[in-house]
UniProtKB/Swiss-Prot annotation:
It is an enzyme of class 2 (transferase). Homodimer. ATP binds at D5, L6, G7, N8, T9, R10, L11, K12, T124. The keyword Chaperone does not apply. It comes from the Bacteria. Pathway: Cofactor biosynthesis; coenzyme A biosynthesis; CoA from (R)-pantothenate: step 1/5. One of its GO terms (cellular component) is cytoplasm. This is Type III pantothenate kinase. The active site is at D102 (proton acceptor). It comes from Psychrobacter cryohalolentis (strain ATCC BAA-1226 / DSM 17306 / VKM B-2378 / K5). Signal peptide: none annotated.
Amino acid sequence: MLWLDLGNTRLKYWLTDDIGQIVSHDAKQHLQAPAELLMGLIDRFERYAPDFIGISSVLGDDLNIKVSETLSRLNIPFEFVHVDANYPLMKSAYNDEQLGCDRWLQMLGAVDRTKRQCVIGCGTAVTIDLIDHAEHLGGYIFPSIYLQRESLFSGTKQITISNGTFDNVSQGLTTQDAVHRGILLSIVGAINEISTRHPNFEVIMTGGDAAIIAQHVNRPVRLRDDLLLNGLARYFDHSKQA
């Protein structure tokens, strides 16, 4: 199988064997040209000869059409994920036309009917979603730590330092530290507040910034880097069975 995740800035792919083990995986910046990037990967995909391609995409219809045209060259069946608030594996109170595909798949990859869960995606945006025994209750969306920093530096003339690390939430003694610690605290504080409101929910985090944020959260956190891939596999496995 070939699994594709077309995000806001990056294209990720996983090639898995017949028992679901990952045999090849990579992530690349697509610069809003995912079809062109895929064209350069066609030879690699052909060598593994996957029998199906499952696709998660948050891109618009125009880019998805170009992606489809490129994938058609492989002569392999492919299908895009479609968010469904009434999906049997997880019901959702959310408007499914506004629920991002990647966000939904992250939840689908984590959902457990026996548990209450708080699923946090730490990518271009930070998404926090509450799931009660496979029922999505809704959630929150924040700009990522890097988007917050970019916005602050582009909109504030007095703050011109754009480098630094997100490694502490104590008060800063320089503008650089104050900016980075304030931004990190805004995310960590929100997670801690939501966790306090929902103390019986297991906290699960995924995404590129998950490890940075998780170490400052005041609850045990389960880090999962495979949620979207697991969600893709679950979605298409269930679709085939249905």
